[in-house]
Amino acid sequence: MANKSRPKKIKAPYRKYVAGEGFSSTRNDNKAKEFTITIPEDAELIETPQGSYYYDETNDTIVKLTRLSNEKKDKKGRKQSPSSSSTSSSKGEKNGKVIESEEARMHSVSVKMVLPWEIQHRIIHYLDIPEKEEKLNKTANGKKTTTGINMNYLLVCRNWYAMCLPKLYYAPALTSKNFNGFVDTIIINKKKNLGHYVFELNLSTILQSGRNSFVSKLLRRCCSNLTKFIAPQTSFGYAPLISLKSCHDLKFLDLGLVSETVKLKELFSAIKNFTKLTHLSFPRSSIDCQGFQDIQWPQNLRYLKLSGGITNEFVIDTKWPTTITTLEFSYCPQITELSIYSLLSQIGDNLKHLFFHYPMPSLAENSLDHVFTYCANLISLQLMVDYCSKWCFSEFMLSKLVEYDRPLKTLYLECSGSLGLASKIHPDDLTIAILESRLPCLKNICVSPKLGWNMKSDEVADLVVSLEDQDGSLYLNY
């Protein structure tokens, strides 16, 4: 038996919120209802993307209109319904414009021109950071820490947020302060999968803030599109090397800051399938060369920086890839003159850029004098005056090429500043080489101030004149 004392259920009318209109009832709205609202003739109609408004002077209020006529234009360019022409003939002139049905309003919205999202996305892609923001986002070292996009763009709407998100995470500017937040965003939030937006991951500024597990998880989350990775000074052990295997699109790998011991065999086991890898930098502190006979070099390697504890046996017995065009030596305490020339005898003719950095304690004061003999196609060369002498630019070491002119364009002369180095290379040594056409393509000479040259002397003036004859210049490199 039913409980008659129970109150009857009453269903509340369902209302939905429509952008630009507010709440509208949808129950029993099977047909669009037509209704008219009269506007005084002297009222000024204001049209916005959210709707139309006019000011009611009698009630001192602003009235919102959402259903404007869409078929005829009035005197001010607004449209008026022909269906109400009979009534508007008597009332239109008197009471003003007539507001039409829901269908007319929807038609008016559909015919409005809207900028496609694809074009907006392309515009956002080319937008630059304002100069004021770039200046504010510079650190004490002068490096930019900007994210590459104005953060206010993400607050415009949901579509703009989705379009700006890839640019925001493309190359995140990480520091010790925001690193933990970045790790939480990439690792913990798996639903958004923000890792596939990261293309460049620079952890060189992270000092004592990460752990091996953090770096390993970051590499796994960002492996799909990661093309550039700079390892941190610490927290790069065995686990990150294992995770590095999944970054198949990697093009730039810099391990120069790693202070932990890296086994050469494990490193090449991780990168052997990197067909797109072009830049590789060895760890600067220590590296274990055991098992180097079985290593397999990336097939498209262009740039190689040797540093750390590489041995003479490794340099002499390794079959170096002929694709290398840029080679750097940086703090190799065990490398001798014999090892360097053994390497240059294999790939010296293919090298376009060759750089030597201080210190190289196993080299003598004239160990680099024969560089031009092994590398005839260099475009840029950096020499440490500590390990070369004036005979490096003599006619015996630097002779003319028979088939073509020597293509060297830029020469860097660096110096550690030790005593007795100011007299090793004199400006006249370079002047004579230029005047004898042994360096016909030389355009730039960058000299370290530690070399001790007097820039106001006649010898330096002669060198400048000889360079100007070749449209070149002399620079003091601080």
UniProtKB/Swiss-Prot annotation:
**Which biological process, per GO, is one annotated for this protein?**
protein ubiquitination
UniProt PTM: Autoubiquitinated by the E3 ubiquitin ligase complex in conjunction with the E2 enzyme CDC34.
- Look up keyword Ubl conjugation and say if it applies: yes
Boundaries of each F-box domain copy? 112-173
According to UniProt, this protein's pathway is:
Protein modification; protein ubiquitination
Q: Briefly state the protein's biological role.
A: Substrate recognition component of a SCF (SKP1-CUL1-F-box protein) E3 ubiquitin-protein ligase complex which mediates the ubiquitination and subsequent proteasomal degradation of target proteins. Probably recognizes and binds to phosphorylated target proteins.
Which protein is depicted? F-box protein YDR306C
Q: Which organism is it from?
A: Saccharomyces cerevisiae (strain ATCC 204508 / S288c)
Q: What is the lineage of its organism?
A: Eukaryota, Fungi, Dikarya, Ascomycota, Saccharomycotina
